[in-house]
């Protein structure tokens, strides 16, 4: 295969030694047909990576360019022209098992900050989200058990993606409210590994502010929540 074109919003491409791509290999048929799932060595001539700095000031995502990149046919995952099926399967499993640990970490980070709040309504909102996050954790365990039994997560993966990312954003909003004016300063130096710079106000402020900005995209990446609701409408309601 000869691959040309860009791939954007690629997480940690600047650290990766391989990348997967959905490439157009046949223009006949429906748009989702004629797509092939390829693994590409990042050291292949013609591959270049351009960084994208996020709203939080981080370099996590990138745009990768492919200029006459030669990829052997042995690097196909699945079958030629059936890459969309492979990608959907990959995303289904990702959406069904990627959120509980992150939510539990976020709760543990926020709990000390919320505990110092004198706003009863904010504390109640936090505990409501805590219960919902733990429900996500239990549901994820249930899905993992079904996967171990050889079953598919099905539409449950879309439900998980919607609920978990919206809980994440709600927790981020609580963190900003709890930080108050300490949530405003842009403290990149305090977040640098090995830096001796101290945070203004709450020690957790630099990370929580960065998380708030980065997670604005949580309901978009991995398949937007609007698309997930359409999947549920079709799979569960027959609409």
Model-derived features: where do they sit?
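Glycine-rich phosphate/pyrophosphate-binding beta-alpha loops
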Residues: 8-13, 55-56, 217-224
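Buried hydrophobic positions in well-ordered alpha/beta secondary-structure cores of metabolic enzymes
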Residues: 3-5, 38, 66, 126, ...
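Glycine-rich phosphate/cofactor-binding loops in nucleotide/flavin-utilizing enzymes
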Residues: 85-98, 182-239
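A short core secondary-structure module
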Residues: 4-50
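A generic structural signal for well-ordered coil/turn residues at beta-strand boundaries
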Residues: 15-17, 34, 43, 59-65, ...
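C-terminal helix-coil-helix/basic helical segment that borders enzyme active sites and/or dimer interfaces
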Residues: 120-123, 134-196
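Glycine-rich beta->alpha junctions and the first turn(s) of the following alpha-helix
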Residues: 47-138, 218, 234
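Short, well-ordered loop/turn and helix-capping segments at boundaries between secondary-structure elements
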Residues: 24-28, 41, 45, 71-72, ...
